[in-house]
Every structure is written in C-alpha cells, then in structure tokens.
Amino acid sequence: FNGTDGDVRVFTHEIGHAFQGFSSSDDRLLDCVWPSYDAAEIHSMSLEFLTYPQMDKFFGHEADAFRWNHLAGALAFLPYGVAGDHFQHLVYDNPKATPAERHEMWRSMEAKYMPDLDWGDIGYAAKGGRWQFQGHYFGMPFYYIDYTLAQTCAMQFWLACEEDQAAALERYVALCKLG
C-alpha cells in the first residue's frame, strides 16, 4: 500500500477473493471451493462496485470523485482487455513474428479497440511496445479476457446495487457461496 486511492481498490478487490474463499470453504466438493479462473475475478471486481456506498468513509467529500474515476476506469478497461486478448491470438497464430511485427500487431489492436489513444511523446508505447507492460501475457496467456468478462458481470452487480443494495448484496453472497 502506498497511501493512494489505489490502496482502496486493491483492498476491496482482494477482499472479494478472500470473501469468496471463506464463503465456499465448507463445500465438500473441492472443485467448488475455488472458482475457475474465468469466474474468480467476478467476486473481486464486483465487490469493488458493491462497496461504493462505503467510500464516503474512506474519501469523505471526494467519494463521488473516487466512484466516478473507478467507473470510468472500469469502462475504459473493457476495450483494452479485448485488445489484449485479440493481440495474444495474433501472436500465437504467428509464432515467428519479429519484435517489430508484434509491436505492429499491438498498434493495430490499439487502433481498432482504442482509436482515441494517443501516446504523444512516449516513444516506446507509440511504437507499439505498450503490450510488454502487461505481465499476464507472459505468465498467464489468455487469462486477461477473463478480467474483461468479469468486469461486465461486476458492472451488472453495480447496476443491481443502484436499484436495490440489499438484494444485490444477497445475490453477491449467494454467488460467493457457490465458489
């Protein structure tokens, strides 16, 4: 933790994983205690949204700004996540691609999915090197799309919470108990 609003995001995200693990720990089917990778991020990303009502306690009069920035970031993440998945398919379909060709593949993904992105004077990123920042592509190939799918599920919990917070929390707890 470093004293920024990111601490709250990371904390609520990781607590979502922990709460899910605790909630399903009594399940006799070991495969149901921990969800598959494609489902695991739903619990954590959803809790980020479901804790919006408590953000006043962290941020006081800046809570609305936090919520807006978090939501904007979540929305902006969707095309980035899709671009990353598409890029990985291109890389694996072209295993002999040179570094320059991989950079060009990434630039084409940025142009397709994030057409307003402008790296300005950040040369390496502008030349297509930004994909190398994402460690998931190296350590857990094809996992990043799971974050994207989970984000859409989490946004559904946010919308449900906007309508009826108690009902949304009940649905969330029920989901966590399923593993």
Predicted regions: what they are:
Residues 24, 34-62, 70-71, 76, ...:
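Post-HExxH zinc-binding segment in Zn-dependent metallohydrolases
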Residues 12, 16, 40:
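Single, functionally critical "micro-switch" positions that shape active/binding sites
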Residues 11, 19, 46, 57, ...:
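C-terminal, non-catalytic "cap/extension" segments appended to globular domains
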Residues 1-12:
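Short pre-active-site segment immediately N-terminal to the catalytic Zn-binding motif
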Residues 16-30, 50:
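Catalytic Zn2+-binding segment of zinc metalloproteases
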